[in-house]
Amino acid sequence: MDADEPEILVTNDDGIDAPGIRALADGLDAVGNVTVVAPADNQSATGRAMSQEVAVHDHDLGYAVEGTPADCVVAGLEALGPYPDLVVSGVNEGGNLGMYVLGRSGTVSAAVEAAFFGVPAIAVSMYMREEQFGEPTAVADYEHAVDATTHLAHDAVTDGIFDTADYLNVNAPHPDADATGEMVVTRPSHAYDMTAAQTGDTVTLYDRLWEAMAAGDIHDPDGTDRRAVLDGHVSVSPLTAPHSTEHHDALDGIATEF
């Protein structure tokens, strides 16, 4: 351990036994001193859900927390490890693309939680085609995403990236998905297409964007995260922690009339 190296807190939402977080921790070990604090089991799509108390267990990677990704960030920052210079969440199995996932994804929400502490953060996910889902992934599958993350972690803090961005949302294509190796700066797509159908006492929710992506039928413009990843690029979206506020004259009038 080098006292001059940055302290890096690593977490995820797929759980501490997922290959993506092991690949990430191994890769970031070349950048700084890594402490892993991650959920004991899968916490995908939990957003920023928070617990009051969580059980913590030793794990060969670090600490396994019986809680959410947001729990892990708070526990890691305030109780379990050295205070980090950077929080990195991932590598998620599957992309986190578009504006609508930012509040839903546990991977991204861990980065947002860190941002509220004023700690720079990176959320990283690996986009997979529909036919790749359901197939087990291995540590080696995450190499491209980890390479992109370590590149950013080396320079982003010292180069002032986080002077204007609270966190980065990184999406890298699966190495078998025609990856170009190019990294591009993007903005989250505003596309949204959820629907639901009822059968008896059950309502099934459908994300039609994933169906469209599988068919190659997307209309996201150049410069968006989804377009970049489907074109084989690594997408990096610099973001600020929600929620932004703007002055509204009309709302002032309504409030005054109350």
Curated annotation (Swiss-Prot):
The ranges of region (Disordered) come to: 237-258
Reaction(s) catalysed by this chain's protein = a ribonucleoside 5'-phosphate + H2O = a ribonucleoside + phosphate
Q: What EC number is given for this enzyme?
A: 3.1.3.5
What's any one GO cellular component for it?
cytoplasm
Q: Does the keyword Nucleotide-binding apply?
A: yes
Pfam hit, one = SurE
Q: Print the keywords alphabetically.
A: Cytoplasm, Hydrolase, Metal-binding, Nucleotide-binding
Q: What is its main location?
A: cytoplasm
- What's noted on cofactor binding? Binds 1 divalent metal cation per subunit.
**Residues binding a divalent metal cation:** D13, D14, S44, N92
Per its database record, what is this protein's job? Nucleotidase that shows phosphatase activity on nucleoside 5'-monophosphates.
* The family this protein is said to belong to: Belongs to the SurE nucleotidase family.
Q: What is this protein called?
A: 5'-nucleotidase SurE
- Tell me what organism the protein belongs to: Halobacterium salinarum (strain ATCC 700922 / JCM 11081 / NRC-1) (Halobacterium halobium)
The gene from which this protein is expressed is surE
